[in-house]
Structures are given as C-alpha cells and as structure tokens.
Design a protein with these regions (language model features):
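Conserved polymerase palm-domain catalytic core
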Residues: 58-61, 65-80, 117-284, 289
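Charged, compositionally biased N-terminal leader segments and the immediate start
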Residues: 1-24
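Short secondary-structure subsegments characteristic of cysteine-rich extracellular domains
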Residues: 358-381
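Core structural elements
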Residues: 21-26, 73-77, 84-85, 187, ...
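A conserved non-catalytic segment of reverse transcriptases
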Residues: 188, 270-336, 347-349
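Short, solvent-exposed helix-loop connector elements
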Residues: 91, 122, 194-198, 326-340, ...
Length: 426
C-alpha cells in the first residue's frame, strides 16, 4: 500500500482499526511501553502489578474495549520538569500504562504511513534517526559555508497544536472512522482544544506530522536554489527545535529574507507562533553563534588555517548537569561515597555520551575536575580529617578503586559524514 501512496498523492488508507485492535499489535505496544518503563499514570497501576495479574488478560480487556468502542482514555498525570536547571518548567503528561498501550498500538499502525511522507531534514523521534545525525547535518552545512543562520524558536509549540488542523492532516491519509474517533478521544482527554501532551506515546508522530508542510517547503527551497552539485540552503529539525542555514555569499542576501518570509507564512497557516525575542538571524562569518539540540555552534579557524564548524555543550547544559550532581552530593552528605558514585555515574555517562560527538574536550575537562573535587570533598567530610582525603585519593584511586565514571573520550568522526541529498519535492 505504501508504494501506492508514493505514486498517488491523494491515496488514503482504510481498514486500519482492525489492525490496531489485534492482540499481536497490543502485545508489541505493551513491550514498547515496558521497555521505556516510566512511572505509573493517574490510576497508579504499575508494570509489576500487571505482570502479577497476567499480561494477556490485561491486553484482552483493552482489546475488548477497543472492539466494542467502550474504550475511554484516562486523564494523564502531570509532572513538572525543570528546564536546564532554571526556574521555568516543562509539563510532562504521564498516561496510564493502559493508555500507553493503546497509543502505542495506534502509532505502530500510523507511523509507517506518515513516515513515507516525512522529509529528510526532520529527525525528531523517527525510526532509525538520531539527534546526533541532526547535529552533524548542521555542522556539515557550516562546513559548506552556509553561515547565515535563521535560529528559530517556536513559542510553546506542543501546547498550541490545533486539534482541528491536526485531524485534517491525519484525514488526508487515513480513511477510517474508528481510527479518527480514537485519535479524537486521545486528544480530547487533555481537556483542551489544542496541544499534544509531551509524554504521550503518539505525540511525537503527531507533532512531526503537524510541521511536515514546513519541512516540505524547506526541502523545496533546497531544490529550487540548487546549482549542481551545490546547495545554498540547508535545515535540520528535531521536534520543535529548528535551524535553517543559508549560503552567506552577497549574491544570496535575498535568499535568507525570502526563506524567512516563506517560513513565517507556513507557520501562520498552522497558527504556530514564533518567539520573536529568542529568534534571530545569525552571521557566523561575523563571529555569531547559535544553539541547536543543546550544542552551541560557531565557526572557528582551524589549525590548517581553514574555517570549520565548532560545536560544544552550551553553558546552560553544563550548569544544569552540575546542579543536578550537586543536589545528589547534598542529599547524601553523610552517606558512603560508593553510594554517591553509584548515583552520579549513570547521569555522567548519559550526558557525556550525548555531547561526546562535538568539540567538547574543554567542557569535559571542567566537568571531570569539578566531579573529582566534589568526591574528594565528600571523602574529607566522611573522615572528619580536614585535608586528608584530598591528596590521599589519587585519580587512580578515584577511578580505579571507587569506580568513578571516567570515559570522557570524544567520539566525533574524523570527518563530517555525508548528508544524503534531499529528495525531490512535488
């Protein structure tokens, strides 16, 4: 059927709901939910409780409700997550496991349909695509002298997705009343007429679909301004984080303005607001910088006297990490250091693994020295002998005997990977 869709732009899929309701689909959705783990929803039901009472009976009950059209989603539990250690928070919605399974089943059926329509520059929460690929795509564009950058910030994007417009986009490809009814119920469970809940299983797919026409416009801009083998426009989007990079040669001065204007027109159609205070056009050739996916990008003169992209963790990300670690040390001030290290190691490992693809050596050295200092301070307080713990514990002792995380190696490739040429846009 996907081949039909490719050749027929108006192709609509039908008979999908029966696949959503199949036990094999629900089983796979349950395994996906369990793999991601997460806290229980508003009903307090845990995976342990489900396993104890029987997974098959749990899934069979869901299937019966779906088939009889008696399924109704519960309200999601809300949890506030601090943004980069600051005062602002992001509200995370935590559905019940039951609702995660239903959303997962719906995603399993709908995702292949919409994946066939998504564009090369979109990376967020898509199969076989990673944030690192988006990071590299931007770095390669800078390496290709695309140094005029539209750094775009969308105001509360997930909270402002219009349900009516979103459902229209789904209906262009889905001709199944039961699927549409189920999707409407999931959206209405938020109690609002707009917004997709951050934390919902199907939300990333829907948020990508909502911005797909923006992606399509940008891919068309890449193609229409292409002069083989060169492109003069490039972009990358990961969910609501988006940057557009344009060749800064004086003859292309008009291009940045034209792309920005078209971008505003497409976003206005979707009723997506641009945060004007945080959005800007940056000229990397004049020393400007911008952030994308936690990295701060700029252009520097390399040892070979050639300009190259430089991207490292932005200061807010480092500050947020240290604040999180500091709180763990504070909460465990009287506990053995081994227990503290057991808590901070996974945090360090995850943070370092993400940022190891960039020019992060200076930042990593700072973090490593800071962590060493905190661990030695903890050892001194534990022994109540001022100064003893500091020199007694060499780096070999900290990393060898105590097992403090120590893999701060960079994993950046020797050369920037080739970005696949954009597909033609019809």
């Amino acid at each position: 059927m996907l081949s039909n869709w490719k050749t027929e732009p108006v192709w609509r899929f039908w008979g999908l709901y029966v696949h959503v309701c199949k036990m094999e689909t629900l089983r796979e959705a349950y395994l996906m939910a369990k793999k991601n783990d997460g806290a229980p929803g508003i009903d307090g039901v845990t995976f342990e409780a489900i396993e104890e009472s029987g997974v098959e009976s749990f899934l069979q009950q869901i299937r019966d409700e779906l088939v009889s059209n008696t399924y109704r989603p519960m309200r999601a539990r809300k949890k506030e997550i601090p943004k980069d250690g600051g005062t602002k928070v992001r509200v995370l919605s935590i559905p019940s496991i039951r609702d995660r399974v239903v959303q997962g089943a719906l995603k399993l059926i709908l995702e292949p349909i919409f994946e066939a329509d998504f564009q090369p520059g979109s990376y967020g929460y898509r199969p076989k695509r990673t944030a690192h690929e988006a990071v590299y795509r931007v770095a390669q564009a800078i390496d290709q002298r695309k140094t005029s950058v539209i750094d775009l910030d969308l105001r509360a994007y997930f909270d402002n997705v219009q349900h009516s417009l979103l459902l229209e986009k789904v209906a262009r490809r889905v001709q199944d009343d039961d699927v549409m009814r189920l999707l409407k119920m999931i959206l209405k469970a938020t109690g609002k007429k707009k917004g997709v809940p951050q934390g919902g299983v199907v939300s990333p797919l829907l948020s990508n679909l909502y911005l797909n026409e923006v992606d399509r416009m940008l891919e068309k801009a890449i193609q229409t301004t292409r002069r083989e083998p060169y492109t003069h426009v490039q972009y990358a989007r990961f969910a609501d984080d988006m940057v557009i990079l344009i060749d800064s040669h004086p003859r292309h001065d008009w291009l940045a303005r034209a792309v920005e204007q078209r971008l505003r027109e497409e976003l206005a159609k979707l009723k997506v607001e641009i945060n004007e205070e945080k959005s800007k056009i940056v000229d990397l050739a004049k020393g400007g910088s911008f952030t994308f996916l936690g990295f701060e990008y700029r252009r520097i003169l390399g040892r070979n006297k050639k300009w190259r992209p430089h991207y490292a963790p932005k200061l807010k990300k480092r500050t947020a990490l240290l604040a999180k670690l500091k709180e763990i040390f504070r909460q465990n001030v009287s506990q053995p250091v081994e227990g503290v290290i057991e808590q901070i190691n996974p945090i360090l490992r995850g943070w370092v693994n993400y940022f190891a693809v960039g020019d992060s050596s200076e930042c990593f050295s700072f973090v490593r020295d800071w962590v060493e200092k905190k661990v030695r301070g903890h050892l001194m307080r534990a022994r109540e002998r001022s100064g003893l713990g500091w020199k007694r514990w060499s780096r070999q002792g900290l990393y060898g005997k105590l097992g403090l995380y120590n893999d701060y190696r960079l994993r950046r490739p020797w050369s920037l990977p080739k970005v696949q040429p954009a597909a033609s846009v019809t």
